[in-house]
Swiss-Prot record:
Superkingdom of source: Bacteria
Biological processes annotated in GO: pyrroloquinoline quinone biosynthetic process
Organism, scientific name: Ruegeria pomeroyi (strain ATCC 700808 / DSM 15171 / DSS-3)
Pathway(s): Cofactor biosynthesis; pyrroloquinoline quinone biosynthesis
Keyword Ribonucleoprotein: no
Family label: Belongs to the PqqD family.
Name recorded for this polypeptide: PqqA binding protein
GO molecular function: quinone binding
Amino acid sequence: MTLALAPTDRPYLPRGVRLVTDRVRGGIVLLAPEKAVALDAVGEAILSRVDGQTSLAALVDQLVEAYDAPREQIEQDVQAFLQGLRARMFLMVAP
């Protein structure tokens, strides 16, 4: 299985995985059973758009509109971030 996402893939958080506000540290955490990942601003910007309905291409389009960075760079960063989460079972993909 390849971890790369196709432009039409629709990433989503699997059952039991959710974004929560960590009131102690003042940030957003990706929480799963017995696992947690503190997110930086980039991770939060990406995952806040992951809903199971939005394709990878549309997600990248939204980020290109929101941030002043080249599309290719955003696409590479999003792909790498989501692949890492997918490898750790924090993310699933609907074709």
